[in-house]
Structures are given as C-alpha cells and as structure tokens.
C-alpha cells in the first residue's frame, strides 16, 4: 500500500512558500478584498496547544479559498506580548521579560509555521515593539486630548503581595486574587480611567450593524446594561443633606420604606448619629475587605447597619430609615437605593431580617409570604391607584419633574475602564506630571516613550510601578526649568490588542498609525475568529477605540469586525471516579475496553474536560505533526464536528483523518488518470464542487470534508479518473490539507507553480440533475424487482419495461394479469391471478 511521507512533503512546501513569498498580501486594485483575522495569541512559555490551531485552520481555509476565488487576501499574525506572566517569570528568574518574550515568540512562530498557515509574515506585529506601541501611546494621547482619558481616585482591588491593583475579573468569589490566591483589599488610589461610558449608546446601537452570534451581542448588551428610569432626590431629616437614587420603577415610590447607601458613599459619615458611629465604622472596615463579586452574591446572607438617620419619602412625606449594606456598590448607579421590599426579593429579605416595613403597592401576591415581583395594577399609591406599569411610570416621572424632586434618566451598567497597572511590563503611559500641578501628554515627536531596561522590576511597594525606581528615566526638566515626573503606571494588556488589526494593514508606516487609503481598502475585517472568552472585554474595548478613531477621522468605518465567529473548545480525554473527581491520565489504565484507577483499582468513567497540565491531558501539536503530519491535524480538527461546538480530542479520530489523506494520495498517484471522461463521476464531482464551495463559505468545514470523502469513495470504484476531475478535487482539498494539495497538484500538472492562485473550480448545474430514477416493481403487493429507468417515462413505457424484465417474467409465467398500475418515477404494481 502507498502512504505519503509527511516528514518530507510538509517541510518542502513550507520552504517553497517562504522562499517565494507565496502569501504576500495582494495589492491588485481590480480584485475584491478579504481580510481574515485570528485573535493573536499571548506567547506563553508553554507554547501552542491543539486548541490554538482550530481557529487558525478555519481562517486559513477561508483565506486559501478566497485567494483561489480571485480575492486580495490579508491574513496576518502577530503577538499580544505584554502581560503579567512574563513579568512574574522575570521576577522569579531574574531574566529580562523582553528576552523571555522573544524566545517564546520564536517557539510559537516555529510551531505555527509547521502547521502550514498562509500568513503574510511581512506584516507580523508585536505589541512590545516600540515601533508598534508608539501608536498605542499616540492613541492614548488622543484620548487624553479629547477628555476621554482622565485621572481619578477610585477604590481598587489592591493585592499587597503582588504590589498591584487587579481588575474585578481577576478577583475570585472568595475575595482572593486569581493569581497566587492572595488577600484582596479595596483601597482608593489615583488611577487612569478611559471614558468608555461616553460611547455606551453607540456601542449598543451599532451591534445591529454587525454579523455576530446573537449570544455574544447579548453579552455585550448586558454588560453595557442600559436602563431607563428616574433619579429621585431624598432629603435627610433634620439636615441640609440629600442623596439621589436611580430607579427603573419610580412608580413604586409609595412603597419605598427604607433607603440603603453603599458603605463608601460620601454622605455616610456626615449623617451617621453618634450612637451608631462605632457600628458603622466597623461595618465599613469589613466591607472594604470584600470584592464586588462577593458583595453582590445573591445567595449570601444580607448584612447591614442603620446609620441612625432618616430620609423623607418625597411622594408621601414618610420617614425612611437610612441603612448601609455591602450589596450596594459605590461604583454602580448613584451608590444609593430606595428599597421597595414588597416587590423586590433582595429588599424583602433585608426587610424581614431587620424587621422593616413592607407596604404592597401592586395588586396580587401575599407580601407577608414573599415579594411580589410580577406586574399588577397600583394600590396604596395615591394618584397612581388603578394604573398599569407604563402609565404609572409616566405619571410619576411627570410628578417628580413638576415638584423638582426628580427627573427621567437613562443609565448604563457599564463603568469607565480602569486603565492603569502598577507593573513594569506594559506600555508606559505618555504623561508628565509637573511640580506646578499641571500634567501634559508627551508630544508626538517624542513618541515612542520607550520602556527603560532595568534589573529591578519588583513592585515598588508604594503603590507605584517599578518604573518609580528608575530615576534617570522618571525625572524630567522642562525648558523653563520646571521639574516633572513621568507617569509610572503602565497600560493593561488590553491596550495593544484594542487596535492591532489596524496596524496589520500598514505595519511599517513610520509617519502614521496606518495610511488612510489602505484603511479604506481593507476595513472592516471580514471575518474575526477566536474564543468566546473574549466576548465582552476585548471586543468592547476594541470597538470603543475604533469609534474614537472614527470620530478623529483616522478610520473610515464605525465598526471594526463585520463578522465574528467563536470556535468551540477542544476538550481533553479525562476520567472521573465515583465521587465525580477528575483523575490524571497517568493514573489510568485500560483493560478490556474499560478504564481503571492504577492505584485503587476503581473503574472510572470517561469524561471530556478542559485540557490542563494537572490532568496531564494537554496535547502538544508538535507531537501530532511529527507522528501524523500537519495536514492530518488540520483535517481532523475541522472534521471533529461543527466549528463552534466543544468536542473531545480523540486519537482514533486523528488516525481516521490520516487514513483518509492516505486514500486521497493513493487515488491521485496510483489510479490511471485519463483525458477522456466516461461520465461515471459527472454527478458526484459536480455535487462535490457545489457542496464544498457552499459549505466552506458558510464555515461548515466538517460537512465539506464529508463530501470530499464521498467523492473519494465514488472515484475508487472506477478504473480510471478523468484528469479535470482529479485536478478539481485536489483544488478542493488543498485549503484543508495544503501540503498534500501542492504535492498532488505537481503530480498532476508538473507546473512548478503553487496551487494557491489557480482559479477555484466551478460546477456544471446540468450535471447535478438526475437523468435516471430507480422504480420498484410489486407483484401481489410484494417488491419483486428494482429497475433503473430514464426519468419521467410515461405509464405505458414503464409498464412495457417492467413486463420485459426477466425476474418479473419468471414471477408472472402462466398467470393471468388482471391489471397493471404504473406510477411514473415511483413504482409498477402488477395484479395477477
């Protein structure tokens, strides 16, 4: 049997593509464009895992397909290389994070090239390259000039052991840090913020203009969290103080029986009575130790302390006790709520716990038993009695505005983006603080502001980044003699990834971020493929920066990514014991088709789980490429199932894909190739071209491969293979298995040219039509024969063909035919006696 040698074929074609710049981005202005983008990776020390190539293979197939269809292709790759892991490694080993990062990038690039992706490496970007982050800094200065980057004292999640603040997303529910499991405390610090809230409405509205999965759009909508309601002002009894509450249900104001302020609310200390001062101070201390996530957990027990003060309900003059409780966050809304316990579960539980009044203002339910959270007509509500929800909201807003105690208000859950990190390994923020109290942005002519090389990258301990220790970099003097200090905070890893897709379009431009004409030519990105874990933050931040650049006239489109696709996760083989605990693969043995724990002998259940080092089930693509070849890995990952499904890795599936490619190789290299078309494969070949073309376009790669298998099976039944069909088939499989595609193309054509630019095959519609049809012949209601006849034969012709058939004649010999019923294209029924 013939097998192809991937160890010879794959490096040969990879060298050919590199030497000939086969995948250089097309610049022919007469061609349509196609921009296929992968979410660029963080180059970790662990290297590529088999999950990475799934998305990369998908965009590569699309790029190769569109290239053959005559498009200019932009298909680039780069590195999101700033970030905490490199800094942590550098601190642990004493190495420079830049050196560590460069080594990791070289390894990633080697692994990626071994998989045969058609990237244009002339466009490679690296977020840690000063020539790249010059423009990240330039964008920051534009945000600063527009008032969209500002400094504020904000409570942050401070981790003493890490010497930095961390984002809400990096705090675990138990209030410790995701990295290291260290205690997290809330403390106010001077931070840089980006005013993403100024773009909230546009970020929401423009989701309608993009072709994204609805689930991702919903996640962004929920994150932005638009709600329309009213602001209501409550005066504090016996003081000149007041506070504002935002509510989406101003119609329930008659049912507000108490108010709750966040422990951090500015008013708390001013209104707390002497009797309550100690209890309030103690509660505030406890609250500062909890993360926002822990504080707002619905399942947790409600805690709170009365301030001793009362607010006056503006609509009925009733006194409402003012409490503080940690489930109200200072960073959300106004940091104060009016509680309507009859119609809100959290307020109801709080009121029951602390014996506060519960007054129903909507008809229905029994508020002694539980909060009534459905809609009903208004009761106990004065001028709103008898009204439904919409009418009552409108009437109450009208009343609040007329009385000067409130107004209609649209709010968003979205918060401004905390943009500073107290770390070394990030882009320096290009701002100088002068001793006269002013701050200025570093002028464009002085960008990039390069990150200084320093041995001492440990956190400073003062809450500033390690850059505070680099005195000669830190201290500057103006021409007029005024001294200044550079900003010591660095940007978060999100910064470089918020605009990298723009730099690929014009990566070597030293004068501007990218040329306007090139941006016009290539934007928006046609397809963006990556993991759903970036659904909210990265995509929201990139959309925000894009809109700012649109307003500045830098980019020509409102949205960066026209179509988004999230590939599923490739799960590892893993095993569970009877308690449901996962068992590492090196502790498992297989006996008679079942799996057992090596140490305990317990039979285990196979259960796919996320690949992880601890379960020892991470599959390294290097091993797969060595044993089976890159083409096998590519075909297997596309054939596992739908691209957006999460599916378990299987060695058997990998072997199956390799066997299929060997059959393809044998078909083209050992079958007699002829210039004469017998017509036997007309239908299946044209069906295959049509199906593969449509399915690749729709990213249904698994069904496209299934159709290629159908063709191979059909072709193997024939003695000879028509040359045009052999070539067309090789073109169809080349995007999936590009090394094998190139090798077989040379076997058929000896052209010496890459298959990459050969025009994609077309199909003949007339060959898809069935000219023959199978009919059944029944005698006494039982099927006695199946005949293939020309389509649309008349009843008379069908009867003639059926009665002439040998099997039928044997059945009816010596019998009387009572009648013959013929149904064209279906059956002939013969009634005999």
UniProtKB/Swiss-Prot annotation:
PROSITE patterns in alphabetical order: AA_TRNA_LIGASE_I (PS00178)
Record-level GO BP terms: leucyl-tRNA aminoacylation
Protein name: Leucine--tRNA ligase
Motif ('KMSKS' region): 610-614
Motif segment ('HIGH' region): 41-52
Compartments where located: Cytoplasm
Record's GO cellular component terms: cytosol
UniProt keyword annotation of Transmembrane present: no
HAMAP family: Leu_tRNA_synth_B
Family the entry assigns: Belongs to the class-I aminoacyl-tRNA synthetase family.
Species per Swiss-Prot/TrEMBL record: Streptococcus pyogenes serotype M1
Sorted UniProt keywords: Aminoacyl-tRNA synthetase, ATP-binding, Cytoplasm, Ligase, Nucleotide-binding, Protein biosynthesis
GO molecular function terms noted in the UniProt entry: aminoacyl-tRNA deacylase activity; ATP binding; leucine-tRNA ligase activity
Catalytic reaction equation(s): tRNA(Leu) + L-leucine + ATP = L-leucyl-tRNA(Leu) + AMP + diphosphate
Family matches, as SUPFAM superfamilies: Anticodon-binding domain of a subclass of class I aminoacyl-tRNA synthetases, Nucleotidylyl transferase, ValRS/IleRS/LeuRS editing domain
Binding site for ATP: 613
E.C. number: 6.1.1.4
